[in-house]
Amino acid sequence: MRAAPSLRRASCLLLAAILDLARGYLTVNIEPLPPVVAGDAVTLKCNFKTDGRMREIVWYRVTDGGTIKQKIFTFDAMFSTNYSHMENYRKREDLVYQSTVRLPEVRISDNGPYECHVGIYDRATREKVVLASGNIFLNVMAPPTSIEVVAADSPAPFSRYQAQNFTLVCIVSGGKPAPMVYFKRDGEPIDAVPLTELPASSSGSVQDSRPFRSLLHRDVDDTKMQKSLSLLDTEYRAGRPYTERPSRSLTQDPNLFVQPTTENIPETVVSREFPRWVHSAEPVYFLRHSRTPGSDGTVEVRALLTWTLNPQIDNEALFSCEVKHPALSMPMQAEVTLVAPKGPKIMMTPSRARVGDTVRILVHGFQNEVFPEPMFTWTRVGSRLLDGSAEFDGKELVLERVPAELNGSMYRCTAQNPLGSTDTHTRLIVFENPNIPRGTEDSRGSASGPTGVRLTLVLALTVILELT
């Protein structure tokens, strides 16, 4: 009687073994893959062991968090046929052998989980199929496609008497995963103070560098401020700030000093006097990163480098933004050189202006490569512009219907960026217009005088006659 339970257990184990033999033996696994680079060929290999007859192999791509399984390849052993479900991919897969699928040119959109399902016949009946599956996550990387370095808050003016902050923005797009971005100055890595990211609502704008103003504020010495204000007052006595020639060395010419608290600064082409309270020591750099996911799975990274600008040492400094990414064999980089504008090239059309013509004066280049983008201000020396304004901001100055009174007038173009300022002058020569008799044009270049009066009287008489 006591042997009965043991006998029953042995019978159950024997029955289970018989059922296992009837179903057949099947194990499935997919060989792991390291991250792959977009554009490379990828082989998904499904290994399985069985002592039964194979029914089919089906490959699935899993999307939407596992809720959707899309067939990408089927092998049907019953009919010994291969069938592709990847019409949209135009049969991008190649069957190497029964359990392997090859993607010759993988894309970022191929990133995600895949499953291999293998079915064998049940030994007891061919109506049943025993299934087993394996899965793998295909991690597709993509190197950055573009890199660009721009200046925030550009264009911006040159400041003589107040130190100002400057921000370089490195924009790296198209990478997956997000790359590592850092800056160098003159080939040497910059040891910057890292800052936490701003909220997503503000981190995407290049213009948003204002939060650094309080971080980089420098205390201004009262004595130096008074001296600077005295210089400013001296310059404005003539009605407009003078410009000054840049020194060829850090030591200024003693002949320029009239007295200890003032300077006599003659007006010249190039203007560049630097804030006296900007220290010559190494600047303190601050670095901030922001990341914006793209709809295609890539990430746009923006690195913002901010410091207190010192035109004396920062002018002609080479800054480079470098990118490291696992999909790149060597760093990717973009370079900019901070340069103050020098020698604007002025073009005037028409080349021979006549009374009544519309004259355009345009800045179409510099003697050097300028960065960041400069801003332009036009003024008329000794008088106001034709429209009555004191100055005009823009690259092109338009004078409509120029009168003869503008002959010989001088125009000043001030081009400036945070590194410096330069003035260029051009004189307008206005020739007589044979279509407009001398003395018949007004200050806007339109016809007036006796001829205009006679024409008005004729029109008035015509109207009176028609009314009577």
UniProtKB/Swiss-Prot annotation:
Disulfide bridge map: C46-C116
Q: What compartments host this protein?
A: Postsynaptic cell membrane
Q: Which InterPro entries match?
A: Ig-like_dom (IPR007110), Ig-like_dom_sf (IPR036179), Ig-like_fold (IPR013783), Ig_sub (IPR003599), Ig_V-set (IPR013106), Nectin/Nectin-like (IPR051427)
In the UniProt record, what gene is named as encoding this protein?
Answer: Igsf21
Which residues does the UniProt record annotate as the domain Ig-like?
A: 25-132, 344-429
Q: Which residues form the signal peptide?
A: 1-24
Source taxon at top rank: Eukaryota
What does UniProt give as GO cellular component?
A: external side of plasma membrane; inhibitory synapse; postsynaptic density membrane; presynaptic membrane
Q: What is the lineage of its organism?
A: Eukaryota, Metazoa, Chordata, Craniata, Vertebrata
The answer to whether UniProt assigns keyword Transferase to this entry is: no
Source organism of the structure:
Rattus norvegicus
For this UniProt record, give its keywords in alphabetical order, as a comma-separated list: Cell membrane, Disulfide bond, Glycoprotein, GPI-anchor, Immunoglobulin domain, Lipoprotein, Membrane, Postsynaptic cell membrane, Repeat, Signal, Synapse
Q: What is its main location?
A: membrane
> Tell me, what is an example of a GO biological process annotation in this record?
trans-synaptic signaling, modulating synaptic transmission
Entry domain remark: Ig-like 1 domain is indispensable for synaptogenic activity whereas Ig-like 2 domain is secondarily responsible for the activity.
The record's annotation in PROSITE patterns points to: IG_LIKE, IG_MHC
Q: In which tissues is it expressed?
A: Expressed in brain.
Task: Write down the membrane topology.
Answer: Lipid-anchor; GPI-anchor
Query: Which PANTHER family does this chain map to?
Result: IMMUNOGLOBULIN SUPERFAMILY MEMBER 21, NECTIN-RELATED
Q: How does it assemble?
A: Interacts (Ig-like 1 domain) with NRXN2 (via Laminin G-like 1 domain) in a trans-interaction manner.
What does this gene product do?
A: Involved in synaptic inhibition in the brain. Selectively regulates inhibitory presynaptic differentiation through interacting with presynaptic NRXN2.
How is this protein named in the record?
Answer: Immunoglobulin superfamily member 21
